[in-house]
Amino acid sequence: YRTANVRRKSGNMSKYICVFCDERKESDTAHLINGKIGICRHCFENLDKTAYASPYQGTEHIAFTMSPFEYTKSMRKVILDLKFSNCKAYAKLLADMKNYLDSYDIWDTFDYIVPVPLHKKRLRERGYNQSELIAKEVAEYLKIPMRTDLLIRTKATKKQSSLVRTERVTNVQSAFKCTEKCDGKKILLFDDIYTTGNTAQSCARELANNGAEQICALTLAIHVQIKLPIIAY
């Protein structure tokens, strides 16, 4: 993905570059940022949708979760560029794929959207929280206030992607802390990827323990090997 990123930063940018197929395209799409990068019509129409674009069953502290796209090789490339190659414009681009949210009239029930926080050490290293950047765009679209101060990460955890499933559970246990009570609040928790769900569950447990009435989770993509029952909402 780094080689592709170098190509995007160099050369003539009179035509935009599709961040998924990495090809130079004519302006055939509304999914375009600053006239330079975007998602071409073909890639957008062929994004791997999941059954989890509808609300699916949550966990002990999560009422339901939504994950509209599969975490495919191309989606992984774009998210990694956003995370590690300082391609912050991709956050707006990814959030621009939010038309799938329009099918549901549940969003005005939430008091806050809360992005999963980074530990301050990792935030200093990276310079930004990619989930927060995407959540900001989604929050503006859904007209839900975003709170980045309600939940903090107190434990410098290892990267979940580097751990086996059993290690991921203990890695994020007691890793988050609420900065204030949230009695009776309905909170939409946002993260970029749903893998095992341990990070979201750890966040939700802390929010619930501090009085949140309901926590739901929204992620951009999900590993398709995750099997969860679909629920009607």
Question: What spans do the regions from the language model cover?
Answer:
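Glycine-rich phosphate/pyrophosphate-handling loop used in enzymes and phosphotransfer proteins
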Residues: 1-190, 195-233
